[in-house]
From Swiss-Prot:
It comes from Homo sapiens. The keyword Transcription regulation does not apply. GO terms for cellular component: cytoplasm; cytosol; endoplasmic reticulum; nucleoplasm; nucleus; VCP-NPL4-UFD1 AAA ATPase complex. The modification N-acetylalanine is found at residue 2. Interacts with MAVS; this interaction prevents MAVS oligomerization and thus disrupts the RLR signaling pathway. Interacts with CUL1; this interaction inhibits CUL1-mediated degradation of NF-kappa-B inhibitors. Interacts with BIRC2/c-IAP1; this interaction prevents TNFalpha-stimulated RIP1 ubiquitination and subsequent NF-kappa-B activation. Component of a complex required to couple retrotranslocation, ubiquitination and deglycosylation composed of NGLY1, SAKS1, AMFR, VCP and RAD23B. Interacts with HOMER2. Interacts directly with VCP. Residues 211-293 form the UBX domain. One of its GO terms (molecular function) is ubiquitin binding. This is UBX domain-containing protein 1. SMART domains: UBA, UBX. The UBA domain specifically recognizes and binds 'Lys-6'-linked polyubiquitin chains. The modification Phosphothreonine is found at residues 207, 229. Its main location: cytoplasm.
């Protein structure tokens, strides 16, 4: 049976004549499939229906084939013979094949668009994951910097406490030296005049014992206690510093000043008392002190 030309087939499938001619020309008359691909890809172009300026037969510098010449308007056959007409059944069969080809092309285009959409979605998710990872890295860097800052502040605080302890030790050494000088410069005690010989050794008055150390127990507000031995001539400030350095973090961790109290008799030690030796405050040889938070002045 006679075959429809590419142009006739496109027109039979419902494409406008001008658009079909343009598709064949721009694809170099490579056949109906190439023309249909072009038509489906450019169906939404605003200039798709604009006519070509050059003759259809000379597109891309190519001479049309004999079958294409038969489909060009105004061109006759080389021998001048007429083209046999298609029967209605042949025309319907060829139209059916063309429609199936169009449907196949449509399915291929939909599958391609679906693959492209899936690829765009994968790209979007990948970019989202990369952005989330970048944010997490930034957060980790900030947390690391904050931890380093806390460690630096802690080291500076410990260094400051060490300087305070060293100063207290120097002050204690100076006071010990001062005490030693003043005690040595005191005149020797006057010997009492001899009295009557006691009738029994048990009647002699007890000798007062001098203590060089004292044991201090400090009760904290949470019910726990600290126990430490100090020299009798150390200042009460040394006890307060020891408490501030060793009490738990939940009690302030050395951040707030503390008030020292004695239980029996009840007494609150003042700042002036902090400069006095433990033996002078009556805390030798042992004593129990109570810690309370110092009220702001």
């Amino acid at each position: 049976m006679a075959e429809l030309t590419a142009l006739e087939s496109l027109i039979e499938m419902g494409f406008p004549r001008g658009r079909a001619e343009k598709a064949l020309a721009l694809t170099g008359n490579q056949g109906i499939e190439a023309a249909m691909d072009w038509l489906m890809e450019h169906e939404d172009d605003p200039d798709v229906d604009e006519p070509l300026e050059t003759p259809l037969g000379h597109i891309l510098g190519r001479e049309p084939t004999s079958s294409e010449q038969g489909g060009l308007e105004g061109s006759g056959s080389a021998a001048g013979e007429g083209k046999p007409a298609l029967s209605e059944e042949e025309r319907q069969e060829q139209t059916k094949r063309m429609l199936e080809l169009v449907a196949q092309k449509q399915r291929e285009r939909e599958e391609r668009e679906e693959r492209e959409a899936l690829e765009r979605e994968r790209q979007r998710r990948r970019q989202g994951q990369e952005l989330s990872a970048a944010r997490q890295r930034l957060q980790e860097d900030e947390m690391r910097r904050a931890a380093e800052e806390r460690r630096r502040e802690k080291a500076e605080e410990l260094a400051a406490r060490q300087r305070v302890r060293e100063k207290i030790e120097r002050d204690k050494a100076e006071r010990a030296k001062k005490y030693g000088g003043s005690v040595g410069s005191q005149p020797p005690p006057v010997a009492p005049e001899p009295g009557p010989v006691p009738s029994s050794p048990s009647q002699e008055p007890p000798t007062k014992r001098e203590y060089d150390q004292c044991r201090i127990q400090v009760r904290l507000p949470d019910g726990t206690s600290l126990t430490q031995t100090f020299r009798a001539r150390e200042q009460l400030a040394a006890v307060r510093l020891y408490v501030e350095l060793h009490r738990g973090e939940e009690l302030g961790g050395g951040q707030d000043p503390v008030q020292l109290l004695s239980g029996f008799p009840r007494r609150a030690f003042s700042e002036a008392d902090m400069e006095r030796p433990l033996q002078e405050l009556g805390l030798v040889p042992s004593a129990v002190l109570i810690v309370a938070k110092k009220c702001p002045s």
